């Protein structure tokens, strides 16, 4: 996912656009994966890095022994009561995902850039699907054109079934997803035709 939009940013620049990227500071990322071979793609890009708040770093520290290990997106450990409890916390208190703590920081930086640069178009990509909530808010505040990129399913992702979600949490997440699908000007997905049809049905669009 990172590589795809990194490449897009490079080609957009070649076409006369000036992409501006908002991301998390390297020192703040709880699940940092670095590929130094991609550095050449960002030499001429404008990148703004923000803080983030991720209380689930404590989860990583307790169960993985390392706060930088991060939250295993597709794996729920079920060794004992504490792992069951941790899965419940992840699934019900961090909706739509464990990166929800970044939203306010990204929103503040986005507002600052939009006002300063006169931005008219924005793109959000997920997962983490909480990034789409940033686009949803910025579009409402500034009447921007917004593209939402779905690299993976949202509320139908297989591992959510292992997080003991309550009906309330699931419904809240589905409402987030539906609002994004209905309010975004364009939706992009490369997952496949079945998921494409699923998104259309959820959004009640054609």
Regions flagged by a language model, labelled:
Residues 65-121, 166-174:
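Conserved nucleotide-sugar donor-binding subdomain of glycosyltransferases
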Residues 1-56, 186, 192, 196:
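N-terminal subdomain of nucleotide-sugar transferases
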Residues 15, 117, 138-142:
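Helix C-cap/helix->beta junction micro-motif
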Residues 179-206:
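A short, active-site helix/loop in glycosyltransferases that binds the activated sugar's phosphate group
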Residues 91-107, 122-142, 148-156:
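An aromatic- and histidine-rich active-site surface loop
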Residues 117, 158-163:
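Short acidic, glycine/proline-rich loop/turn micro-motifs
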Residues 8, 130-133, 137-141, 154-155, ...:
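Membrane-proximal helix-turn-helix segments that form the acceptor-binding/catalytic region
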